[in-house]
Amino acid sequence: MPMFSPPMQGGLPVRALEWVRLRAAQLRNDRGAIVWMAIVAALYCGATFVRSQASDWGPDHMMILATDIAQGRVDLSSLTTINDIVTIDGRHYQAMSLLPTVPYLPLVPFEFLWPFSRWVVSAAIGISAGWLALPVARRYGPGGSATWWLASLGAFGTLLFTLTIEGNFYYLAHLEAVLLTFLLLIEWHDRRRAWLIALLIGLAALARPTLILVAVPFGLALLAESKDRVRTAVALAVPLLGAIAVTAAWDFVRFGSPTETGYGIAWIEAPLARLRDQGLFSLVHVPNNVALFLGGGFTVRETFPWLEPSSLGHSILLTTPAVLIAFAASLRDRLNQILWASVILTAIPVFLFYGGGGAATYGYRYEMDFVPFLFALVAIALKDRFGNLEKILIGLSVVFVVYGYVWQVYK
């Protein structure tokens, strides 16, 4: 393929088609990537199929909402759950961000897909995110065999795998956020286009609102290195403000206020309601959340599988201990400072939130807001050292996550 391609003629569809053609040509020459994509797709699809056989089938909550939206309404015509539901004037609304509903919209005309839409959508988003673990590893890691260890960590050693196979609309927001954050990391390494950086952050925030905070370190870094700061500021502001406007409009049409997310007024189970009464976000929740995140463990039961994780969430050290490698990344490097700032800023609302690690979830699922940044830091740290200890931590991460899969199927 020539190093420089001729200018593309025509409108946006023609340019998009040409972009796809060029990327397909690059992929054909990358056998490693093709094999990686096949492995991820096969293992994710196989695990999803097995998990689906151990679950009840029926109408999918987000599929119902997508069909209702296609008919011009934003309330739910029928309910599969009463959790996180806001009832106003006899109408029922799901207290949730917008983006998890969007992948269901293309399936609305195909009624035969509705019963298993949750498996299809989650698998498609999760597999795409798993594929991107390889290009992120290639860009941030030391290369060589470490690339494949890192890619395996990203796709099979984090909660990305266990959240994907559940086919749960709550988890879909995390899958979308990981996918978009990986794209953000790739764009940051490659071209650093301010408008695209902001667009990816804005879209990620439409899945997980906490991620809007990473606009601060990434935006400041772009402004610091820009020769035209006004233009860069505008390029950053437009997509971010657009995402905020979409969120505000979505809240307004459902709850009558652009600042009402619904989480503070939705019906939830009594134990969670008591926690929420202390504050949707509050310092009161921090000690318990941090204790779960760092120290939550397993209990032993008499039947297989014998190790039972807490339904409130358990330690990241018992799901993805390889994140410890990230602490070896030097804080003197500008990139590492941006990544650590992103980790800290997204972790703050996670630990202030009343919901713990995410009810009835293997691991601490809210950690997935910042795990992609830790993943990049792990890759960077491996440039200085990639020995037996690092391999053991990555291997343990995969083992713990695979156990999570076993638990979800046989619990």
Q: What does each model-found stretch correspond to?
A:
Residues M1-K411:
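Membrane-proximal envelope and lipid/glycan-remodeling enzymes
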